Amino acid sequence: MAEAEDQQNFVAHNGDQVPDQGSDELHNGLPYQVHDETLVHQPYEVEDPILEPQQYEVPDPTLEPQQYEVPDQTLEPQQYEVDDQLEYHQYQLQDQANEDVQDHSQDDLQYQPQNQEQFQLQDEAHDQAQYQAQGDVQDHNGDEVQDKVEDEEGIPEHLESLQKSEPEEDATVGGEEKRWPGWPGETVFRMLVPAQKVGSIIGRKGDVIKKIVEETRARIKILDGPPGTTERAVMVSGKEEPESSLPPSMDGLLRVHMRIVDGLDGEASQAPPPSKVSTRLLVPASQAGSLIGKQGGTVKAIQEASACIVRVLGSEDLPVFALQDDRVVEVVGEPTSVHRALELIASHLRKFLVDRSIIPFFENQMQKPTRQMDHMPPPHQSWGPPQGHAPSVGGGGYGHNPPPYMQPPPRHDSYYPPPEMRQPPMEKQPHQGISAYGREPPMNVHVSSAPPMVAQQVTQQMQIPLSYADAVIGTSGSNISYTRRLSGATVTIQETRGVPGEMTVEVSGTGSQVQTAVQLIQNFMAEAGAPAPAQPQTVAPEQQGYNPYATHGSVYAAAPTNPPGGYATDYSSGYGY
């Protein structure tokens, strides 16, 4: 039994069939009992302590520490050191550039604390600090660029120096841009308005102008001007509000302009609206230069945006009550386009502020003629013939003598020059007024060194054949009404006593008004007469009569029922001036 059990144990252990032998027999020289002890213990003791520990312990102490510890100790510190050196070099270059640009040493100190703070930041916030430093540099340089732009816009040097010396905390309003020169101050606009349009601004019992003042918070005053003037200056002022796109002064100006264009006076309901209107502003010469801009860039942009013609007229086109350094800004175009151009012009000029204490000075100076009053001619003199010697154009046959009233004696030429000087040939006339819309300014008398016009009342009489009555009066009085509206003069027509076949046309008003009315009457007569001579400005032969003035028909004459813009539009319709 024992032998059988030993044989079964051996077979279970080795998996081999062992011959049935006794326990004292040797198997390969070894007893079965000894062979069993070695074979049973050796396979498990050799494999377990050698193979298994090497399989799990070797990778842990050798490979894994090298894989994670080496990059942390070598690569990452080197990478951040290189970045810090490059950024430090970059800040050094920025500091050097700022030292070259800035005049004050304080600007350099602004960057040193920032650079020191940059290097103290942790690595994870490093990028954010870098962007912040770059933003500071851009803001610093941006202030300098803004100063240069404002200098180019025409800010006077003495105001520019005051502006730079102001503290930074007071330099901005509403977080936008620097305050304008003269701050705090008021914006003042002066618009020239025909006298007959003043009523549409005031309204019945002043209700219209009172409503505009209450709604816009602007101050509106209509200046009377010297006696005899056909225009009035409407001054609109108000406290400037830079944060507002439509400050009180601009709002008031635009509303006054709308009343002039769409006024509800009696004339507006009788005449159709014209296709072209004209608006004129009085501005100081310095503001006019700023409005033109460098190489005309500013005024060109306004013209393109509004589809209007915007021009700055010379000193010869100033009204008698204008200040010496004033200029006239004229806008011509369709009513809506002119309104848009006026808004753009006011937006550009609103930055020129005026102290409120100076506004009464404007009011007082503009209510009296200020332009060379010492050259005013005596009351008994005019550019026409001596009183009591009315010129005779007809008598003895029409055109028998040249019109003597167009060539007064030298002693009567004191202020208004003779027609040869007042009306040069068309090809030699300077480009003034609104020639694109059918007229030149009626006051072309300011030539050479002649003084400007003054509000002196004169009277002119003309003897005209009755055959020209229809041309002068027009259908249903259209021509004579057109002459009165355009010139502003008083024109009366009556038959000449004792001279059959003639009529007397009497024109009264200021020198410019009389000149314009006479010119218009001559143009109507020329259109009904013979062709013009080759030399329009010379004295005509006897057989040509009024023909010397035919060439001026294109300047003043127009269809009275639908005048083509310019002053004709101003005085013949409800659309302003």
From Swiss-Prot:
GO molecular function annotations of the record: RNA binding
Chain positions covered by the region annotation Disordered: 1-107, 158-181, 370-431
KH domain location: 186-253, 276-345, 457-521
Alphabetic keyword roster: Cytoplasm, Nucleus, Repeat, RNA-binding, Transcription, Transcription regulation
Listed SMART domains: KH
Superkingdom per UniProt: Eukaryota
Protein's cellular compartments: Nucleus; Cytoplasm
UniProt note: phenotype after gene disruption: Delayed flowering without a significant effect on the photoperiodic or vernalization responses. The late-flowering phenotype in flk-2 is rescued by the disruption of PEP (pep-2, pep-4).
GO CC entries: cytoplasm; nucleus
UniProt cross-references to SUPFAM superfamilies, sorted A to Z: Eukaryotic type KH-domain (KH-domain type I)
GO biological process terms, semicolon-separated: positive regulation of flower development
Record's function text: Positively regulates flowering by repressing FLC expression and post-transcriptional modification.
Subunit structure, as described in the record: Interacts with HOS1. Interacts with HUA1 and HEN4.
Classification via PANTHER family: KH DOMAIN CONTAINING RNA BINDING PROTEIN
Full protein name: Flowering locus K homology domain
Organism: Arabidopsis thaliana
Gene from which the chain derives: FLK
